Structure formats: C-alpha cells, structure tokens
Amino acid sequence: MYLDEYKRWLAADLEDSDLHPELAGIEGNDDEIKDRFAVALKFGTAGLRGVLGAGTNRMNIYVVRQATQGLANWVKTQGGNQTVAISYDSRIKSDVFAKTAAAVLAANGIKVRIYDALMPVPALSFATRYYECNAGIMVTASHNPAKYNGYKAYGPDGCQMTDDAAAIVYEEIQKTDVLNGAKYISFAEGVEQGLIRFVGDDCKNAFYEAIEARQVRPGLCKTAGLKLVYSPLNGSGLVPVTRVLNDIGITDITIVPEQEYPNGYFTTCSYPNPEIFEALKLGLDLAKESGADLMLATDPDADRVGIAMKCPDGSYELVTGNEMGVLLLDYICAGRKELGTLPEKAVAVKSIVSTPLADAVAAHYGVEMRSVLTGFKWIGDQIASLEAAGEVDRFIFGFEESYGYLAGPYVRDKDAVISSMLICEMAAYYRSIGSSIKERLEEIYAEYGRYLNVVDSFEFPGLTGMDKMSGIMQGLRDNPPASIGDKKVVSVTDYKNTEATGLPAANVLTYGLDNGATVVVRPSGTEPKIKTYFTTLGKDLADAQATKDELAAALAPLFK
C-alpha cells in the first residue's frame, strides 16, 4: 500500500520543485519509502510536527494543505467570524507553509489575518484573540533541529486546540486526499479577493502594550543601567523582544551577531533549544567578554527563554527553568504585594512536573498554586476558567520547567517576550538594591530548602519507537517498582486514573519515595522520547545531586 502511494506521488505533477528529485532519489529503497509513506503525520492537540520532505510522513505543502482543509471543515461548523490568524517562525519553508495554509482557508471562503513577517507564538495567540478568530495557526517546530517543521493549531481563546476539536479536525484530515483533496487558490488571489489580510499595526501595538502593562515596577529599568546580551537563536524573537526592552528603558543590548537574523538552518547550534548549553554558548561567551549582567536566548518561535546570570564573583551561571519559574514567582508576588497590586486570592499555575519549591513560595505569599498536566494549554485552561467566572485578574503567573512562562491573561500560551521583560526587570531591581538574581536564589534555597530538579530523556527513534515507548509505560503500570535503588516507593500516582487525580487523563506516572524525592515518568508529546523528572531535596546541592544520580542509575535499565 505504501508503495502504491509512493508511486502516486512520483507520477504526480508536484508544485514544489524540491519534492520530485527526493522521490526519484529513493526509488528502490524500500526502508526509506516505508518511512515516508507507511504512515501519515498525525494531527493532535499540538498540531503536526515532522521532518521536511516528500511523503505523507513528512512536512511539505501537500500535508499542510490537507491539514488546513481539515481545519477549514471544522471552522465552517463553528459560526462566529469565520476567521483564522496565522503566524510563522524562521524555519525552512515556514513562510511558504503559512501562505499555503492561508490560501487553502481563502479557497474555503474563510478570512485570514496573517503576519507580514515572522512573529512568535505569543503574537499568534494574541492576534487570534484580538480579531476574535475561530482558530489560529503557528508554523513552527519550536526548538527541534533544522530538518523539522510543524503546524500548531489554536482555538478561539488563543490556547492550543482542545482534544475534542483536534479529534474532529483529524477526522476531517483523514477524509481529505493529501495530493488533491484540499481546496486551493493562490495567495495573491486570496489577497485580491479581500479574504487574506495582514495583521494590522493596531494589533501589533496592542500586543506590546499588553506586555508592558505587566511590569511589576514600571519605570525601574530606565535608570537601572542593566547591560544585556541577547540571542534570538536565528528565530522570531529579535523584533518583539528588543522592542519591548527598549520601550521599558533597557537599551544597552548586545545581540549575538551570528544568531541575530532569521536562519532556519540554525548553523551555530544543531538544536536551537535554550535548555541546552550548546545553544547558549555564543551568548555566554559574549556576556563574559562584555561583562553583561545577564544573557538571554529565546527559541525559534520565542515562547521559551534560557538565561545565564552574572554572579557576585564575576562568573556566569545558567539558570534552570524551574529556578527561573520560582525566581519570577517570588519577584512578582513580593513586588506586587509591596506595591499593593497583588490581587486578593491570587492564583499561580504550574505543571505537575515542575518544582514543588514553587508551591512553598506561593504559600508564603498567600497565593493559590494550581498544578496541571504538562502542556501549556492546561495553564491556559485555568486562565479560561477564571475568565469564565469573571475573575481573570486573579491570575498572576504560570510556568513549566521547560523554560516557558506567562505573567498575564492577554495570551494563552507561554511567552518569551514578557518573560524576557520581567527577567530583565527583576535583574535591574536586584541590581538597584545592591543584590543580584544569584543572591536572591540562594536566599530562597536557604529559606525553603535545597531542591534539585533534573530531567533525563531516553530516545526511541524510527517506526518502532512509539511501540517501544508504549510497552515501557505499560510495563511500569503492570509491574510498578517497589523501590528505586535503595529508596522505597511509598506512593504511585497514575494520571490515567482521573478519579484519583481530579485531572484529565494523561500518560504520566509519579513515584513518591521514602526520602521525600519524587520521580515522574512520561512520554514526550512532541518527540520520540520518554522523559524522567527527578526532584530531590538535600542539605546542599551536592547532597541533592548524589541522590538524583543514584535514582537515575537505578531507573536507566528500564528504558533500554
């Protein structure tokens, strides 16, 4: 069957000139043909993500057309404005895929608001809400290597699409022939007909104003003299991040030159992920050279930000996603409490795999901390529930350990633009009182205990990878470990059991150990990986690290 589909593509008059040579080049290579055509990329709540190239299991204009036709079929049942917002990042063919999606929607009589240049995830979420759209599309593969691209779908609230809506869209996609089933006109024709319009300056300015309104101490940065090194990692963050920072008074910004402008090949780092050192190295080197107070790097779609801080002794230290989540929570709560802007019954939200240190900090300030499933849409869901109750102003902060933060209800996905602003403001504040981010972090550890949070990943590539991952997770359910190393398991939480957790079902297992440590095991939602999240508490960092290392060594054989 996959050979027949391959032959159909090979014989077709394909519009993308890159695809036919690829197809001709794999003729007779059964393994390669099978990998490209035996299955199709599956549309889920995170949309699509895959390697660029020819085939149903690849990202190309035909797969994008098919997906967009499925989305269009759903939009047409939703009433409302019959409008979809679109943005894209710097990845290879992101602009092509964005215009392709716009053209399919226009051919279906659906209006489109598309950015005239690359803009990040939060800008897409904002435009979806601003124009009261039925849906939004963000063409990106986040921090994946250059050979990937993807297609994130958003609901009318600017949050990633719900499970129910995604399932309906997927059904419609399956009814649509990938090569010729989608309605299609040219992008130019869609513009000429008035169906495709660019996002206006009114929307762009409103986005920046919404972010800048969330400063904790407005005006502080104008006189702080903060010195910053910033890298957009060749992605979409350059314009919005520098615009907001300049607006609030941070003007001493040095951009990492090799990573300044959009480049989907990501030639300076094979994996443009601000969680890893390789992506931050050039920025860190430049920070050391220039004596900057802070170095920030945003990922290609600018929804996550990595940080290196200057320590009192002049050295530089990377800050983890959990640490920055706690630091921002502490800064926002303390600052707003001091200034009288902390709402009554304030609410913060974190994912279940993020550090419990955040719970302790929230409790200290009288803030309700809610824990939700992994995936920022669940944080967005909590904002929506507050909004439905007329209490959206209670939301002050949400974060995930994977370097994603949000400090306001103006969008419903993580936002590296506001995160960059607040991190800089926080650094400027501590600088103004003769302290530093590093010193405040150590004060937090002294007050609440030395938490260590580490994520390990195990990769399962290829067609058999998903089956192997499923088998491992099922094995853990069928034969739960009584101990991990020499630490006894005292509690097991299976998030597929909705009655026990009070949350939607999820393929996540949490083990509580007799020494107070926790281990969370879950498959990645976007990559062929199983992730293990370790939280250990020790008298100092070395003690907490030693416990983590023992637990990781004991678990590793289960993932082979």
State where each predicted segment sits.
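An N-terminal, well-structured beta->alpha segment
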Residues: 4-101, 108, 191, 196-224, ...
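Phosphate-binding and adjacent anionic-ligand microenvironments
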Residues: 288, 292-294, 315, 335-522, ...
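Long hydrophobic segments that form regular secondary structure
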Residues: 211-212, 221, 225-245, 249-251, ...
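Gly/Ser/Thr-enriched, mixed-charge loops and adjacent short helices
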Residues: 32-41, 149-279, 286-287
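N-terminal small/polar loop signature for handling phosphorylated ligands or for N-terminal nucleophile
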Residues: 85-148, 249-306
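Conserved phosphate/anionic-ligand binding catalytic regions in large, soluble enzymes, centered on
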Residues: 37-57, 141-142, 228, 232-244, ...
